[in-house]
C-alpha cells in the first residue's frame, strides 16, 4: 500500500536504451561517465602539483579495472546468496550483472594505483590527494545509475522526496516482507550523491586554503565518507550480510571512520612533507607554490605594462 504522500520521486520509466543491437544500461553508462570525469579532474589536479600527466594515464589503466574487479568481489562476498546466486568461475568479472561494493573497489584500486606510482618513482601521497575529490565526484555520478536500477533505497517514507520503487524492484532487493506493501522509500542513493559532491568541494577548498600534509585529503575522504555510510547503513533495508544484528557495512564504516581520523592526525603531526625537487602543494590558480613564487609578474616580464 502506498504511503500517504502528495509528492514523490517517480520510478524511472526505463533503465537503458538501444544503440543498434546493443542495449546500453544507464547504470553502466553512469559508471563510465563518472570514471572519465574522475580521470579528467585528477589529471588537472596532478598537473597542478607538477605531476606528469602520462603517469596518471598509466595509473588509471591499471587501477580502474582493479577497482571494478575489487568492488565486484566485495559485493559477491558480502551479499547474501538469496540475492546474488553463486556465479560461475567468471562471477567476479561479471560486472554486467550489476553490483559493486565501494570498499572493495577503493582498496583494490588504491593498492594497484600506489604500486604503479611507486614503480614510476613518484610521490604516491601527492597522487592520493589529487584523486580524493575526484573519487567522490565519480561516486556521485555512479549513484545516478542506482536510481535507474531502483536500488540502494532506504526505509519506507511519507516525505515528499520519497522514491517510488516498482514491485519487481522491491522483490529483487530482498527487503523485509513487512515493507513490501509500501511503494515510496528513502532515496538513500540521492542523499549520498549530495554528500559526495559536498565533501568533494570541502576537500578541494582545504587543499587550496589549508596546509594539509599529503595524503591528508585522502585520509579525510576515508573518514568523511565512512562517517556518512554509518548514517546510510541505518536506513538501508535491502538485503545485506549482518553481524550482531546490524548490517556488516555498518561496522566497516565505523572502522573506516576511526581509521581515517587516526590516519589524518598521524599524517599532520608526523607525516613527511614532499621531498625537495618533488611537486609542492597546489595553490589557487592551478600552479604549484614553487612555480607561483618563481613566476615573474606581468609588469616585470612586460615593461610596457607598467
Predicted ranges, named:
Residues 1-306:
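A feature for loop-to-transmembrane-helix boundaries and adjacent hydrophobic helices
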Amino acid at each position: 500500500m502506498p504511503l500517504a504522500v502528495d509528492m514523490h520521486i517517480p520510478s524511472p520509466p526505463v533503465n537503458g536504451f538501444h544503440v543498434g543491437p546493443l542495449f546500453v544500461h544507464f547504470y553502466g553508462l553512469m559508471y563510465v561517465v563518472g570514471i572519465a570525469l574522475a580521470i579528467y579532474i585528477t589529471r588537472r589536479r596532478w598537473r597542478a602539483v607538477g605531476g606528469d600527466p602520462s603517469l596518471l594515464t598509466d595509473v588509471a589503466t591499471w587501477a580502474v579495472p582493479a577497482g571494478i574487479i575489487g568492488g565486484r568481489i566485495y559485493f559477491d562476498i558480502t551479499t547474501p546468496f538469496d540475492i546474488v546466486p553463486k556465479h560461475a568461475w567468471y562471477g567476479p568479472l561479471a560486472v554486467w550483472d550489476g553490483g559493486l561494493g565501494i570498499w572493495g573497489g577503493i582498496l583494490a584500486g588504491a593498492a594497484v594505483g600506489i604500486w604503479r606510482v611507486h614503480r614510476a618513482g613518484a610521490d604516491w601521497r601527492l597522487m592520493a590527494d589529487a584523486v580524493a575529490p575526484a573519487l567522490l565526484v565519480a561516486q556521485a555520478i555512479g549513484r545516478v545509475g542506482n536510481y535507474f536500477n531502483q536500488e540502494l533505497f532506504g526505509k519506507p517514507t511519507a516525505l515528499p522526496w520519497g522514491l517510488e520503487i516498482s514491485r519487481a524492484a522491491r522483490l529483487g532487493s530482498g527487503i523485509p516482507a513487512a515493507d513490501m506493501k509500501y511503494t515510496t522509500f528513502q532515496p538513500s542513493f540521492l542523499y549520498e550523491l549530495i554528500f559526495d559532491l559536498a565533501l568533494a568541494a570541502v576537500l578541494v577548498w582545504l587543499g587550496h586554503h589549508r596546509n594539509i600534509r599529503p595524503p591528508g585529503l585522502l585520509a579525510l575522504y576515508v573518514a568523511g565518507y565512512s562517517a556518512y555510510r554509518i548514517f546510510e547503513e541505518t536506513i538501508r533495508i535491502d538485503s545485506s550480510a549482518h553481524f550482531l544484528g546490524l548490517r556488516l557495512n555498518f561496522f566497516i564504516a565505523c572502522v573506516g571512520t576511526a581509521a581515517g581520523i587516526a590516519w589524518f592526525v598521524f599524517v599532520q603531526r608526523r607525516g613527511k612533507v614532499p621531498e625537495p625537487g618533488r611537486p609542492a602543494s597546489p595553490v589557487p590558480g592551478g600552479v604549484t607554490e614553487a612555480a607561483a613564487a618563481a613566476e615573474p609578474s606581468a609588469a616585470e616580464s612586460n615593461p610596457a605594462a607598467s
